[in-house]
């Protein structure tokens, strides 16, 4: 995982979009925004994922392959949906099994922070955080999606500032 401030240029979202000079963002800074990160130790991620699930009460999981082959005719529409700025009522938890991609989150100053993820990364985006996702130029990512309850992924596009989970999120990060 690598995190840095996004350059905000209006070019292909699958490009790195790293400012020049680069402005790195540390794991501690991500944590201040409520984002959690684990680096899974080896190719056999299952035991580590099971422990994280037990510790954090994640009850359900599934897998998604985000690629032209995996999504077929839905690929372009799904990528557009994933890249629209949104939030969720629940945490978004992803263990990256194969491939690479980018999660962009809004930091405390409402700047975009780009988080490059690859196989072996597990990331938790808190409920209420504005974010988006895209593949990189390899156009392939396979991830395990983890859920506290039923496997549901419902994006709520910005603006959602009046939603209770957005307000709860802002209260938590203000305290950090």
PLM-predicted stretches and their roles:
Residues 63-89:
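Conserved short histidine dyad/triad with adjacent acidic residue
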């Amino acid at each position: 995982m690598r995190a840095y401030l996004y350059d905000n240029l209006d070019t292909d979202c699958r490009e790195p979009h790293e400012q020049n000079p680069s402005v790195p963002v540390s794991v501690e800074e991500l944590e201040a925004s409520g984002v959690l990160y684990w680096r899974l130790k080896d190719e056999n991620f299952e035991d580590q994922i099971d422990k994280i699930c037990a510790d954090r009460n994640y009850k359900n999981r599934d897998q998604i392959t985000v690629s032209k082959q995996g999504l077929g005719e839905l690929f372009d529409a799904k990528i557009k949906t994933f890249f629209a700025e949104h939030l969720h009522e629940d945490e978004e938890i992803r263990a990256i099994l194969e491939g690479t991609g980018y999660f962009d989150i809004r930091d405390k100053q409402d700047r975009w922070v780009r988080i490059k993820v690859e196989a072996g990364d597990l990331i938790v985006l808190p409920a209420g955080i504005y974010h988006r996702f895209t593949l990189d130029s390899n156009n392939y990512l396979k991830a395990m999606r983890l859920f506290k309850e039923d496997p549901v992924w419902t994006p709520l596009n910005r603006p959602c500032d009046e939603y209770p989970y957005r307000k709860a999120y802002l209260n938590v990060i203000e305290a950090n």
